[in-house]
Amino acid sequence: IYGNMLVSNDLNGQCINCHSYQNYGTNNMQFHMRQAMGGTVIVNDGVAKKVNLKTDSTLSAGVYPSWHPTLKLIAYSTNLTGQAFHTKSSAKIDVQDTKSDIILYDIENNEVSNISAIDTELEVFPWWAPDGKTLYFCSAFFEYKDTVANETEMIDRYTDVKHNIYRKSFDPQNKTFGETELVFDAAKDSLSATLPRISPDGRYLLFALGEHGCFHIWHADADIYITDLQNMQTRKLENINSDQAESYHSWSSNGRWIIVSS
């Protein structure tokens, strides 16, 4: 990890994160810079450019990204994010979104448009299917009882956040999305599903499942599950899970390997 604090201070320090590549290649990629002179750097056909994805109609700049596999498009979540620090719980840190939506960035036209922005839903973690014709994402129903003190209420009710996995069809020619379809209903079992990842052959959905929230890397109860999208059967991957957190998983380009953070 680059120790940038060795050559900077609290005024000009930076966090560089959320690297994302197009279809396992290296010509097109993006990463975010936080703090001083922050923004998103997009490398398009080998040319790097810094962009500001925040508009008057979005919550924030782009956060969690997913490149379209063939087109110059990136789906992002936009998030108003905070942290809570617990003294009694064994999970000492919780990362929480008070609001979140899904947007689409058209690189060639430098245009941002909303994909899903429902006031009572916390939409996050978009991910394209390998054929580029479906966008998967997570969303949790959350209705504030106090319309003013959102941050305080989220800290009090953070265990109420239960994400399901959804998808929308996508027309690559017209760049339009279809209706939202439920793929995996975690909330019915009072659980939360995050980080949908589709295998390169398009058959399997890999995701993390935990008790609540969207930041399962901090949650010891989070495990990796897989759904066969042909018959919609879901099972826990017993041989790769432990009694600690499993999350932030990815497929290899040939679909024969899975990498998991534990």
Each language-model region and where it sits:
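Repetitive beta-architecture junctions, highlighting loop-to-beta-strand starts
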Residues: G38-G39, T98-I102, H163-I165, A222-I224
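Loop/turn-rich, solvent-exposed surfaces of beta-rich toroidal or solenoidal domains
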Residues: S190-L229, N239-S262
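Multi-bladed beta-propeller domains
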Residues: Y2-Q14, V43-A61, I103-L122, S169-T194, ...
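Residue-level detector of Asp-centered blade-edge/turn motifs that repeat once per structural unit
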Residues: N23-G25, P69-T70, P130-D131, P200-D201, ...
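Short, conserved, GDST-rich strand-edge loop motifs in beta-rich repeat architectures
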Residues: Y76-D97, C138-V161, A208-A220
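Conserved beta-strand position repeated across blades of beta-propeller domains
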Residues: S20-Q22, S66, W127, R197, ...
